[in-house]
């Protein structure tokens, strides 16, 4: 793109000096280490520490990625919510395999979950939906996610219309809005290290236990 060498991405580099990750730092259950790192990301005041890159694949094998917010996690899996007509929801209906990446750049860390996504029950979705701010609930009605629109004004007009409609009482749950639980069987932790000698550990589920291996950077 540039011939005068004013900007070359190959020259953008830095050392990773925030410390390493040793086997003695690991927990038996990867979710415990994930929770520790997530809390540290929050304490470090990282912007959107629960933001994760969600990767899905369409029927042609074309991968897609987008940023989504984590809303719950436990031993059963990681939970996020979305419009069920969205591209990611449609792709997960065809192929439930999914990857989640948490990029905590300021801490030189990332965590990758691999697994399968399954739809949440209506009761679970309803409980979360009504915990959201009312304007966010209305916003769920406004957006037919991933559909083509002529202008932003279309969304804003629809929002004002529905805000008036739902001014009194509760906002009902849209039939096209739901959530997914990612049941993971692989978790990789990456910690940046000096001289590009990064630390990587992968947890892989084996029956009722987790097998842990160190990976070359």
UniProtKB/Swiss-Prot annotation:
Q: Which Pfam families match?
A: PNP_phzG_C (PF10590), PNPOx_N (PF01243)
What residues bind FMN, as annotated? 66-71, 81-82, 87-88, 110, 145-146, 190, 200
What NCBIfam families does the record tag this protein with?
pdxH, PRK05679.1
Q: EC no.?
A: 1.4.3.5
Q: What family is this?
A: Belongs to the pyridoxamine 5'-phosphate oxidase family.
Organism name: Yersinia pestis
Entry protein name: Pyridoxine/pyridoxamine 5'-phosphate oxidase
Q: What is the gene called?
A: pdxH
Family matches, as InterPro entries:
Pyridox_Oxase, Pyridox_Oxase_CS, Pyridox_Oxase_N, Pyridoxamine_oxidase_dimer_C, Split_barrel_FMN-bd
Specify which residues bind substrate according to the UniProt entry for this protein: 13-16, 71, 128, 132, 136, 196-198
Domain of life, per UniProt, equals: Bacteria
Q: Name one GO molecular function term.
A: FMN binding
Quaternary structure (record): Homodimer.
**A biological process term (GO) from this entry:** pyridoxine biosynthetic process
Details of cofactor binding:
Binds 1 FMN per subunit.
Which cofactors are required for activity?
FMN
Keyword Metal-binding present in the record's keywords: the answer is no
The task this protein performs is described as:
Catalyzes the oxidation of either pyridoxine 5'-phosphate (PNP) or pyridoxamine 5'-phosphate (PMP) into pyridoxal 5'-phosphate (PLP).
Keywords on record: Flavoprotein, FMN, Oxidoreductase, Pyridoxine biosynthesis
The UniProt catalytic activity note for this protein reads: pyridoxamine 5'-phosphate + O2 + H2O = pyridoxal 5'-phosphate + H2O2 + NH4(+); pyridoxine 5'-phosphate + O2 = pyridoxal 5'-phosphate + H2O2
What pathway does the UniProt record associate with this protein? Cofactor metabolism; pyridoxal 5'-phosphate salvage; pyridoxal 5'-phosphate from pyridoxamine 5'-phosphate: step 1/1; Cofactor metabolism; pyridoxal 5'-phosphate salvage; pyridoxal 5'-phosphate from pyridoxine 5'-phosphate: step 1/1
Enzyme superclass (EC): oxidoreductase
